[in-house]
Amino acid sequence: MSRARNSYRNVTGSPGGVSIRRSHHIGCLQAYLRPVTDAGLLILLTCSDPACRTVAPHGGTAPRFSPNPIAAGIPTDGDPILIDISTSSTSNGLCSRLATTGQRLPGSWLIDRDGKPTDDPRVLASEQGGAILPLGGMDLGYKGFGLALFVEALTNALGGHGRADEEPRWGASVFLQIVDPERFGGKTSFLRETSFFAQFCRETPVPPGKPPVRLPGQAALQCRKEQLANGVALYPTIMPALVPWATTLGVPLPITSSAR
């Protein structure tokens, strides 16, 4: 990311784009956005996994895609707008965690092998033959399906390696594009516009007793500030999973809040 950002500063002409194939686990896409927006640049970041099939196309009953997230960072005069959404109704990670703990999803975001909606994450097990619905669910899933195809084109197709290769190992295909507003209408007018519509959205009337409109990334930025000051809150199953690795590698575990 740093290499792409720094190289872009030295290139004139069209916006810069980078394609990566067989990447390691990329993690949360939003984590990569802030350094770019802090430099006053616009960023688009997407990824797919050619070896992963957990999401069904709209109208189908068998998985064909990975969740195919799309992330974008938009600079403003204040905090940036940080967008990070899957083109599926939910993520593999959430389904895995809930299946492990025997919990259900908040909604019927999956389908079983017969195409019936369900909130049971266990249908994603290979022998069950279920799938995650695309963003929009049973009724409007054509929207998520279309976005998933767009991500497939940006990542696997542009990278020259994808599902047609029947990759047996997991590995992300990544597409990154960075745009300098100065090369278009100018940075000043860009920030004027992005800052205006950010504030315009915050000032939108809401029903009585409801919180104000929250921009994408706003809650995450606030959580980051709090956890930098008070410590990082981990999902309950993470620390137990780290214990055997820490023991094997001789690495001391961090002190948890309950042990302080």
Q: Can you say where each PLM-predicted feature lies in the sequence?
A:
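Short glycine-rich or small-residue beta-strand-to-loop segments that form or flank ligand, phosphate
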Residues: G16-R21, P134-G136, L176-E182
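Phosphate/diphosphate-binding glycine-rich loops and adjacent basic-rich segments that engage nucleotide
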Residues: T54-S126
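Conserved active-site and cofactor/substrate-binding residues in soluble primary-metabolism enzymes
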Residues: G27, A31, P67, G130, ...
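A glycine-rich, acidic short-motif signal
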Residues: M1-I81, T87
